[in-house]
Amino acid sequence: MNLADFDYHLPPERIAAEPARPRHAARLLHVRGDGLDDRTILDLPALLAPGDLLVVNDTRVIPAQLTGRRGDARIGITLDRPLADGTWRVLLRNARRARPGETIAIDGAGGIAAEVIDRAPDGSATLRFDCDAETFRAMLDRAASLALPPYIPRPAGISEQDRQDYQTMFAAEEGAVAAPTAGLHFTETVLAALAARGVGLATVTLHVGAGTFLPVREDQLERHKLHAERGLIGPETAALVNATRARGGRIVAVGTTSLRVLETAAGDDGTLAPWHGETELFITPGYRFKLVDRLMTNFHLPKSTLLMLVAAFAGVERMRAAYAHAIARGYRFYSYGDASLLERA
């Protein structure tokens, strides 16, 4: 398939600039094999069965947006992920003024600077910050801000409300640049109803990287390569997933991040083992899902890798119909928008 197969027109007023309040007041489009149902997040427990298992991503978003100076040039820096040698993979804006071997002075960082180790044509680069890990983390709290997606305008800057809104209630393991947004809809009220229904809960970790903000530039999908993201599945989660499947329960991934880490670690027979490492799994129509039975996810950008993933999961034509329905019915899109619950095609 080509990139143009995943394009659609979204009226600008359908892009959510703020989350629903309370979080569980968001709408939920149930995409079934034989139709579409308009629901809310509070209906989620009734749409699942006793013995099903929800798998959520417990990554925590870090302040990852820095600015720096090279001479009179202002350079934007979005952290992506740390590398084993202590350097950081980043995305740069105005990167032409930052060549390998040169140094960027970080704004508001008390004298901390970063050496450019290498730079790629897509704006990604490797930086070495001249401080230890503890000092670096403290510097982020002083000098960095949340890297909100560009479609969430904040002309006055990031607020304390944003810092609260852009974390899920499951956030525990620091490392994400962007939030796993399907998890933003959960509250204690929803969790209590799920527990009363007999639905289990398990956690995985996938640290969403800065590559999530990059567009797909290849018209032929097979030529596109995802940026690597770090993840972990512990032994307790692996055991819960395997036990759920053995007794006939369904695995419900909360978010594309949870789905990608589960599918990365699953064996060909769907058995899950503890895992940690990096994944570059790029799911497009034709992919054979090994483990996940249902997917809860927000509504994604045109021509995005996440839209390709949901089309692979629920079917291309079914998702076209679902998105047309959601636009016509006034659903709110993207990170702070409404959600969908997809049954696997």
Swiss-Prot record:
Keywords: Cytoplasm, Queuosine biosynthesis, S-adenosyl-L-methionine, Transferase. Its EC number is 2.4.99.17. Pfam families: Queuosine_synth (PF02547). Its main location: cytoplasm. It is an enzyme of class 2 (transferase). The keyword Kinase does not apply. It catalyses: 7-aminomethyl-7-carbaguanosine(34) in tRNA + S-adenosyl-L-methionine = epoxyqueuosine(34) in tRNA + adenine + L-methionine + 2 H(+). Transfers and isomerizes the ribose moiety from AdoMet to the 7-aminomethyl group of 7-deazaguanine (preQ1-tRNA) to give epoxyqueuosine (oQ-tRNA). This is S-adenosylmethionine:tRNA ribosyltransferase-isomerase. It comes from Acidiphilium cryptum (strain JF-5). The lineage of its organism: Bacteria, Pseudomonadati, Pseudomonadota, Alphaproteobacteria, Acetobacterales.
